[in-house]
């Protein structure tokens, strides 16, 4: 992970003009959101699907209260994509997540599994020293509950945010997870380019000895329309960016990059 000061420097590079701003970590989604934790009586640990996401807060220039709007008076341009891949990739790299194995008696972290992305799934603890989690990278994974060692994984072809469940039928154990990229973060995650993060919802069930394979992904690339010649000036473009992030970006995505939950306005 980048030191906090370097993370702040990256985010400041995204600021819209000379706007007084503060960068907080975790952001408004918290260090842990609704994704269920789990507890293992075998280890005594709690397993937390944690979020590691900064957020930029700054005063919206000329804020005026509007009926029916969010009215947070925050400048949503802070931290939004610039269109420069070298800059935007650094900001995307700040959005992380991890599993924290926490000892509630000693009040300390025992081990941590770092994820490449944020908004990962809820946890399941089972007997046999196992924990399970689906993640935003499109995998369903089993770990050792005592050490965090990865033992098994299966590709889900979509991000998974729900917790898995386990049950028995005629004495045979199954584990089921509802896989699909969605929720508050996914609404504006701007992940439409990544096939694993598209909202391809399905119910996946596993058992020892199961041998069914998922069919190949058959997504069709979106048709990109021919863009009209830009006639607006620099100030008009900047104002349009401000208005978009104020009124549209919260659902349709930062920098007009939709997470795929609702239509992408670029196509």
Task: Locate the predicted segments by residue.
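Short pre-active-site segment immediately N-terminal to redox-active cysteine/selenocysteine motifs
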Residues: 236, 244-250, 255
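Gly/Gly-Pro-rich "capping" loops immediately C-terminal to redox-active cysteine motifs
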Residues: 241, 253-267
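Electrostatic cytochrome c docking/interface patches
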Residues: 219-243
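Beta-sheet-rich non-transmembrane sensory/scaffold domains
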Residues: 1-226
């Amino acid at each position: 992970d980048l030191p906090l000061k370097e993370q702040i420097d990256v985010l400041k590079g995204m600021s819209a003009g000379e706007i007084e701003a503060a960068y907080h970590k975790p952001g408004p989604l918290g260090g842990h959101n609704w994704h269920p934790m789990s507890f293992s009586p075998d280890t005594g640990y709690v397993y937390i699907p944690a979020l590691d996401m900064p957020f930029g807060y700054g005063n919206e220039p000329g804020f005026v209260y509007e009926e029916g709007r969010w009215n947070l008076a925050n400048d949503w341009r802070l931290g939004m994509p610039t269109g420069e891949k070298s800059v935007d990739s650094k900001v995307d790299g700040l959005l992380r997540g991890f599993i924290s194995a926490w000892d509630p008696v000693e009040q300390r972290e025992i081990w941590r599994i770092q994820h490449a992305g944020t908004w990962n799934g809820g946890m399941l603890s089972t007997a046999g020293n196992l924990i399970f989690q689906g993640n935003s990278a499109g995998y369903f994974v089993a770990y050792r509950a005592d050490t965090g060692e990865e033992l098994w994984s299966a590709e889900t072809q979509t991000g998974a945010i729900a917790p898995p469940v386990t049950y028995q039928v005629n004495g045979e154990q199954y584990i089921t997870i509802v896989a699909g990229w969605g929720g508050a973060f996914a609404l504006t995650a701007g992940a439409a380019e990544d096939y694993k993060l598209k909202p391809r919802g399905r119910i996946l069930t596993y058992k020892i000895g199961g041998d069914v394979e998922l069919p190949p992904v058959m997504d069709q690339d979106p048709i990109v329309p021919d863009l009209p010649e830009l006639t607006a000036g620099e100030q008009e473009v900047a104002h349009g960016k401000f208005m978009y992030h104020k009124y549209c970006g919260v659902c349709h995505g930062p920098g007009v990059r939709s997470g795929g939950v609702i239509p992408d306005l670029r196509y």
